[in-house]
Structures are given as C-alpha cells and as structure tokens.
Amino acid sequence: MDLFEYQARDMFEAHGVPVLAGIVAYTPEEAKAAAEKIGGVTVVKAQVKVGGRGKAGGVKVAKSADEALEHSTNILGMDIKGHTVNKVMIAQGADIAEEYYFSVLLDRANRNYLAMCSVEGGMEIEQLAVERPEALAKIAIDPAVGIDQAKADEIVAAAGFAEELRGKVADVILKLWDVFKKEDATLVEVNPLVKTGAGDIVALDGKVSLDENAEFRHAKHAQLEDKDAADPLEAKAKAQDLNYVKLDGEVGIIGNGAGLVMSTLDVVAYAGENHGNVKPANFLDIGGGASAEVMAAGLDVILGDEQVKSVFVNVFGGITACDAVAKGIVGALAELGHTANKPLVVRLDGNNVEEGRRILNEANHPLVTLAATMDEGADKAAELANAAK
C-alpha cells in the first residue's frame, strides 16, 4: 500500500525523523487556515500517489495565507497523470541549502534490502541513475542485521557526504531504517533530504510503501488506506478476499494459483497478437477453493469491468477437483443471471477433469465454450474479445 506524502510525513515524525510542519486540507478554506496556523512562507502540495506533481503545477509556494487559498483553489480537482487531486498538504517553507537523496527498499531480485543514497537529490532518481550512475551509492543491506551505526556510516561515506555532515545524515538514516523495519515497509524514500540554512538535516518529501501481507501486525495501517483513491473493482475484490489486479486489456482472466494465472496472462497476450492485439484485463487468482460462491464473486468483479469483452477461466484441478470447479461455474452463472452476459472460455485439466467437462457439457450454457488446452482457450478468448470490440 502506497501512502500519501502527508501520511509518510506523519509516520516519519512518529519515528523521530526530522520533518517540517505539514497540515492536510480538503478545501481552499482549510488550506488558508492551515497556512495561517503554520505562518510564514508555505508550500501547497497536491496529494496524489504519482510523481511529476511539480511539473504538472501541483506544487506552489505561497507567501501568504491568501496565496495558499488561491493556489489550493487551482490545485484541488486538478488531474495529474490520471489522478484527481482531492486534498493538498500545506507544508512549512524551507530554507534549503543543499538537497540529497536516500531510500531503502526491498530488493526482490537479490533477496535482501538495498539502500541508495546521493548528495545530488531533488531530481528524478531514475534520470540520475542513468546519466550519472557513479553519483548514486547502492549498498546491500543484510536483512538479519539491517542498518546499524556502522552501516549508516558506510552509506554516507559511499555517497560522498562532507565529513562534517556524515554524523547528522547517518542519524537520520538510522531513523528512516526504523520506519522501514517497524512499519513493515517495502520502500522508504526521501527526495529531497535537505540541509537547511541553519545546518539541520530535514526530510522534505517522503514516499512510503507498506507490505500489505504484514497488515495483521499493524491494525492502524487499515486507517491509512484511501478508499476514494482505490480502483472500485480492486476494492470490491478485496472486500471479497480475492487476489485481483486490474489491467488494461479486454480478456478477463480467472485461474487457481498465482503461477498459473501469470502464465495465462502471457499466453493470452501472445494469442491477442493475432486477434486485434487484445490483452489480459486482469489478474484474478481464486486460490484452492472454486466453490460457486468464489467463482460467482470472481465473475461478478470481472464482468463489472466495462473493458472486458470475454472471460478465460483456466483451472488445473488439484486439491479442488475439476468437477467441483465445473459445479462452481454452473452455479455462478445461475447466481449471476442476466449480469453474466459475456462469453466464457473454460479450460479444465487435472484431477477429475472428465467429470468436470461432462458437467459443463450437460449444462450447455450458451455463454460457455470448452477448450482442451490453455493455448486453445487463450486463442478462443482473444478471438471472442476482438469480435466484441
């Protein structure tokens, strides 16, 4: 789960990371009141979970509360890369002397953590990594040890901080590691981390991604979820405990097991090249149980996506036998009734497959087409989706 900047700022503050004052506002009037409370120069910052806010006009300096009112009026409701701005943060203005960069993230490829640090912050880190990779220090972090004082000292030295700054920056890095570890984050990023005119090190902007698999350890994290910003279909699937991710294609996908579903996405994308370049519309893993209720919930979510033109159900019977899956499909179609109005291609294999196919053949539902193989099913689903475009 990605946090808004103001949520990351509050989390930083709770762990002792030095930050400046910041107040979230949902209306121009609230923004003006926040600017008056903070006093002096403030910055009106659009709160969206996407980069490029400044270039899009979503970050403005306000020299007075009236200017904060004016800027927030213009920013609220703005569209930034498909994200509507529903709130702004009024942040205390900073006297910036230098800008730096720091992040720590889960490095899945190497099965550990990775810290990245640079004395050249404030710009797109991807651009810096490409144009001047030597300016970005990358330090592997042993998960069993984490970032201790010695590792923090190593990071600031590798990044090239001046000797007199290393102690201060290392202290902030230790606190940011505390956020990463204790909040079960997969990413903690500060860009920029700044030195003020007074010589203080302050986290001026923050990005935090939390591991949703660790939510059971953090009851308070549920309060951080922005229901309004969530995709409605993903929110609906989550409410029904379905593993669903919305994509941009036309072929709805249902499978059992993440590996099989990911393989199905690839096969459908390949088949789509011969049928109008249609693509998968989603990832949906119904897991080991394929009861009528689970299948109905999955189909209900997928058929609620207006982009979907056909559905490919690809199931390998294991613990859950194919006859149970077939009964689930028939029951789901009966339960959904007229809302099930798009063609389904079903491929079954594995445990009790013949009985499963018999059940579907006897049901003889007009929307259901049986496929013998995954390739055949993907091709048929892509063909049907293209015909309905």
UniProtKB/Swiss-Prot annotation:
Pathway: Carbohydrate metabolism; tricarboxylic acid cycle; succinate from succinyl-CoA (ligase route): step 1/1. Binds 1 Mg(2+) ion per subunit. One of its GO terms (cellular component) is cytosol. It is an enzyme of class 6 (ligase). Gene3D superfamilies: ATP-grasp fold, A domain, ATP-grasp fold, B domain, Succinyl-CoA synthetase domains. Mg(2+) binds at residues 191, 205. GO terms for biological process: succinyl-CoA metabolic process; tricarboxylic acid cycle. Its EC number is 6.2.1.5. It catalyses: succinate + ATP + CoA = succinyl-CoA + ADP + phosphate; GTP + succinate + CoA = succinyl-CoA + GDP + phosphate. Pfam families: ATP-grasp_2 (PF08442), Ligase_CoA (PF00549). Its cofactor is Mg(2+). Residues 9-236 form the ATP-grasp domain. The keyword Magnesium applies. Substrate binds at residues 256, 318-320. Keywords: ATP-binding, Ligase, Magnesium, Metal-binding, Nucleotide-binding, Tricarboxylic acid cycle. It comes from the Bacteria. ATP binds at residues 45, 52-54, 94, 99. Belongs to the succinate/malate CoA ligase beta subunit family. PANTHER family: SUCCINATE--COA LIGASE [GDP-FORMING] SUBUNIT BETA, MITOCHONDRIAL (PTHR11815:SF10), SUCCINYL-COA SYNTHETASE BETA CHAIN (PTHR11815). NCBIfam families: PRK00696.1 (NF001913), sucCoAbeta (TIGR01016). Succinyl-CoA synthetase functions in the citric acid cycle (TCA), coupling the hydrolysis of succinyl-CoA to the synthesis of either ATP or GTP and thus represents the only step of substrate-level phosphorylation in the TCA. The beta subunit provides nucleotide specificity of the enzyme and binds the substrate succinate, while the binding sites for coenzyme A and phosphate are found in the alpha subunit. Heterotetramer of two alpha and two beta subunits. This is Succinate--CoA ligase [ADP-forming] subunit beta. It comes from Pseudarthrobacter chlorophenolicus (strain ATCC 700700 / DSM 12829 / CIP 107037 / JCM 12360 / KCTC 9906 / NCIMB 13794 / A6).
